[in-house]
Structure formats: C-alpha cells, structure tokens
C-alpha cells in the first residue's frame, strides 16, 4: 500500500482587496501518496497557483492543517521547513527564472551544487535528450526560445529527484509536440523514480495523466 507523503486538511486562504475579503481557498483538502500524480484544473485566477505555493510551503495559510512526510508544517520552525523543502520538494513555475549568466546545463546543475551533491551530468544529459534539448546544453537562456527555457526549468526541478514535484502549468508555453514530450517525461520520472507529482493545467489532455483529477472552482476543490 502506497504511503501518504502529503496531506492537507481544510486549508483556508484569503486576501483583502481594500476592505473586501477574497476567499481564494475554502476547506481545501487533498492527499498525495507515493508514486501518484494529481492534476488540478480551473480557470485563470481561481487559486491554482496559490494552492501549489501553500502545499509546497512557499506561502502561509490562514487555517487548516498541512503535513508533508508526516511533519505538521505549522508545528515546525522556518529553518526546518526550509530543510524539508530542500530535501523533498521540486518546483516548476509558470515563470522559469533561469539565470542569464549560466548555460542551460549550468542552470540545471545549480540545485546539485547548492546541496553539495556530486554533479550528475549523465542524468542531466539523459533528461536533455528526452526533451530534445541535447544541442542546447551549452546555450545561454537568451539564446533559447520560451518553450526551451520552460523545458530546462523542468529538468532543473527534477535533477535531484525530489519526492514531490509541484508543476504550475508546465505545458503552458509549449506547442503540442513538446507538450507531449514533457508529459512523457513526467510519466517516466513518476514510474522510474517514484516521484509524486501535483500539477495545475488548463489543458484537458494534460489533466488526463492524473491518477486523481480535481477542479478548483470558487475556492473549493472538486473531483
């Protein structure tokens, strides 16, 4: 039986626009098991990115409970949350934030340098090959298309084989062919490296890859 690695119960999050309270997440609950893919759809601005940021410990929430690797996020200090994030979590954002002074390969290897791990160039180049980027490894971000930069950002997020990958609209900047290759890579790392994935998408085809499929509507998560 697969182990639960993330559990959110009745998460609530709101913002204020002047004096008006905006409820972004209402009683948001979700459970992620090892080797599982969860997809979340919903219209632009419905709170999908906020949900990922909260689940990935990048944003605070107003009430509720979040456990990652059986650790209650509200009961541990910021330094322990940072350690948990660095050891267990990878992110792919809508905006890739590649460092312009480094090549594509160097950008990908940055997480291994930060964590003091041995460079895994072979694994990195396998991922470049999977996404048809082998010829771009020595290119700088300014020399690459938006789609190429998005794919490199994904490789950077998974190079250390995190237990949980959060991907915010990972195919949003890709054409159909490259979107299919990216989906195939996500499926591969899920199966071969037991990585669990939560991703948001507008694309119905991408949503189909989820073992569990949800829609976020008016702050509430629905199956």
Regions found by a protein language model. Name each.
Residues 41-43:
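The feature captures the beta-strand-to-loop junction immediately N-terminal to the Walker
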Residues 56:
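Helix-to-loop junction immediately C-terminal to a conserved catalytic motif
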Residues 64-75:
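Conserved ABC transporter NBD signature motif
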Residues 102-109:
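Short coil-to-helix segment of the ABC ATPase nucleotide-binding domain corresponding to the Q-loop/switch region
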Residues 140-150:
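Conserved ABC ATPase signature
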Residues 159-163:
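A short, proline-enriched helix->beta-strand linker immediately N-terminal to the Walker B motif
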Residues 165-168:
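Catalytic Walker B motif of ABC-type/P-loop ATPase nucleotide-binding domains
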């Amino acid at each position: 039986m697969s182990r639960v690695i993330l559990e959110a119960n009745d998460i609530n999050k709101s913002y204020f626009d002047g004096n008006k309270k905006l409820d972004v997440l209402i009683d948001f609950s979700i459970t992620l098991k090892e080797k599982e893919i969860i997809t979340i759809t919903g219209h632009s601005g419905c709170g999908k990115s906020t949900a990922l940021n909260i689940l990935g410990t990048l944003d605070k929430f107003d009430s509720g409970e979040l456990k990652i690797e059986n650790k209650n996020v509200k009961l541990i200090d910021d330094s322990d949350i940072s350690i948990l994030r660095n050891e267990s979590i990878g992110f792919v954002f809508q905006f890739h934030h590649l460092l312009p002074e480094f090549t594509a390969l160097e950008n990908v290897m940055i997480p291994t340098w930060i964590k003091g791990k041995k460079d895994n160039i072979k694994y990195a180049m396998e991922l470049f090959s999977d996404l048809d980027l082998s010829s771009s490894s020595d290119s700088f971000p300014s020399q690459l298309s938006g789609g190429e930069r998005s794919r490199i950002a994904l490789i950077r997020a998974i190079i250390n084989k995190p237990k949980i990958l959060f991907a915010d609209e990972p195919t949003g900047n890709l054409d159909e062919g490259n979107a299919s290759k990216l989906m195939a890579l996500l499926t591969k790392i899920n199966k071969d490296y037991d990585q669990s994935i939560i991703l948001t998408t507008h694309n119905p085809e991408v949503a189909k890859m989820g073992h569990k499929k949800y829609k976020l509507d008016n702050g509430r998560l629905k199956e």
